[in-house]
Amino acid sequence: VHLTADEKAAVSGLWGKVNVDEVGGEALGRLLVVYPWTQRFFTSFGDLSNAAAVMGNSKVKAHGKKVLNSFGEGLKNVDNLKGTFASLSELHCDKLHVDPENFRLLGNVLVIVLARHFGKEFTPQVQGAFQKLALGVATALAHKYH
């Protein structure tokens, strides 16, 4: 993915303000609620029976933090997303058998959560940069599937 200098500045500027614990848990939780078929990959997480259970689930929050920390690593290596996410792509493809479409869905949910948290600061330009980055990360995570 190619981000312009302005897009990189917009992404890194906002990312420095992101509460990874909070945003990660909310993003993964929303993915599991909005797209309930994704829950099949998280059967060991316990009660995912309704939105309140999902959003309050400590394992969802912990894994969301882990996911968002990985996304943050991608920000540090935006010019080499395939390399950055190669081992995670292999894990999700070969061992976990995750549908690669889920990566795109999670990226879109992340953008929604960021917009919710940052309001007016999440301008259309910032959104565009994050959408581009989220798609790049999703593509890198899906790389082993091709």
UniProtKB/Swiss-Prot annotation:
Modification Phosphoserine, positions: 44
GO cellular component: blood microparticle; haptoglobin-hemoglobin complex; hemoglobin complex
Origin superkingdom: Eukaryota
Keyword line: Acetylation, Heme, Iron, Metal-binding, Oxygen transport, Phosphoprotein, S-nitrosylation, Transport
Summary of the tissues where the protein is detected: Red blood cells.
S-nitrosocysteine: residues carrying this PTM: 93
One biological process term in Gene Ontology: hydrogen peroxide catabolic process
Domain Globin: from-to ranges: 2-146
Binding positions for heme b per the UniProt entry: 63, 92
Gene3D superfamilies from the UniProt entry: Globins
Pfam families: Globin
N-acetylvaline: residues carrying this PTM: 1
GO molecular function, one term: metal ion binding
InterPro entries (alphabetical): Globin, Globin-like_sf, Globin/Proto, Hemoglobin_b, Hemoglobin_oxygen_transport
Modified residues (N6-acetyllysine): 59, 82, 144
Family: Belongs to the globin family.
PANTHER family in the cross-refs: HEMOGLOBIN FAMILY MEMBER (PTHR11442), HEMOGLOBIN SUBUNIT BETA (PTHR11442:SF42)
Description of how the protein assembles with itself and partners: Heterotetramer of two alpha chains and two beta chains.
Functional summary from the UniProt entry: Involved in oxygen transport from the lung to the various peripheral tissues.
Protein name: Hemoglobin subunit beta
Gene: HBB
